[in-house]
Amino acid sequence: MSSLAWKSINWPLVDSRIQRYQTRIFKASKENNIYKVRCIQKRLLNSLDAKLVAVRRVTTSNKGKTTPGVDKQVFTTDLQKEKLVRKLRLDGKALPIRRVYIDKSGISIPTVKDRAKQALCLLALEPEWEAKFETNSYGFRPGRCCHDAMEAISLSLRNHSGENHYHKYILDAGITKCFDQIDHEYLVEKLNTLPEMESQVKAWLKAGVLENFLDNNKETNTRENIMGTPQGGIISPLLGNIALHGLEDHMKEWICTKPSFAKTNRYSKNAKRKSLSVIRYADDFVLIHQDKTIIDEAKKEISHWLLNGPRLKLNEEKTSIRNSNEGFNFLGFTFITIRRGNKTRAKIYPSRKSQEILILKVRNVIQRNRSASAYNLISVLRPIIVGWANYFKYSECKKCFQKLTHLIFQQLRAWVFRRDTRNGRKEIKQRYFPSGKEYYFGGTKHKDNWVLSGKTKDKKDIIKENWLPHLTWVKGEKWVKIKGDKSPFDGDNLYWDKRTITRVNWNLRKAN
């Protein structure tokens, strides 16, 4: 490669060739043709395209591209990236990982070289396991998100047997230090992959953890990692999902062994499987069933499965059994069932805790920006407020958004009148909340006399203006759940193009 080769790479062509490899791996894995899977994976790992994509991800696309590992190396120039591509191969080695503590959790930062190797492995492993993963696993998987899990729970709560089961029981569970305590031998045995990838994954799992790196006030020390998958690695979410894969299928088989719990005593095996819903997002999951006895026994069965497999335990503080009529929280939402006549309706709202977190975050931003201009304050608050609204707009959000809009307005009004005590209130109001203006947001025109606005001049003395949209301007929508067996690697471009268009439109509305 010449020094200009990086800029002249035809990335759409490279991506399309990688996609063809991954589609073939996915389909071979679906057919349980292990020999074919391994052959295609080997070709992919050795291809120049895969190495280019892996290096691009860790040096160009990733937000952590300028964050060094223990070798203090970053790859920013085209020449450095080209050299990394030439040298990239799975050698079964891994440098110690740098541990950074955010709040109470530790994030592990591998070197850029190890990140590139992880990205290379991910290209080969992910399509194989996407063909195997269970229908209702949604965390850290391509093409799936929190809203798919939300809708799956809603569908499960709405479905009932027609035998006066107007509520269900929910096991809302979490796993204690899931990613930090997964058994290495269990994970590697379950992975069952090519020798070069197996030895490389072992090296990453066993890589030492370097504490207090770049902290001159503390002594640097390296400790051995004897269990768990380091959080922060590109491949870590996939390894976590592999370790927990099988939980849903196990519980579906388990429920079939239980005696019939219906009045008719005619529950078939298929009906029993459908009666139990297991919906997982990473290390948090819910079990839903109409019989509390089944839920009580299911909790014990899950504890047994976790202990005898990945060597994990349920987090008793995060685990509870609830009645759906009382409501429960999951992924920031509150789910509750309401009986109306002969029908059961499932309602989803932003949880009270999620609302409190938003108000606290807005308050903290305002307090940190007491002397900032309105323009700068809006620049910080807008992505927070609009991002929160776009996440929760797929629930029953209208009244919640109205309440939060009022609370945020009170904070903003206090900030405005506190910073300017020399002028009259009408003058201050007109300066920060101009009257008679129209605003376009989400393709809709809004006219409001209490919208916080700000102005600034750029380097060319051009006046720039911004404003803070109200939460209520974000309209509620219905989320369309992903089809259970679909994957971005399945080759169904028409299906994924339609979903991508929906996401693009969502992003455009978010930016407006």
Map each language-model feature to its residues.
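Charged boundary/loop elements
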Residues: 3-64, 123-139
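A conserved non-catalytic segment of reverse transcriptases
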Residues: 206, 210-215, 309-374, 379, ...
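Extended C-terminal regions of large enzymes
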Residues: 411, 416-512
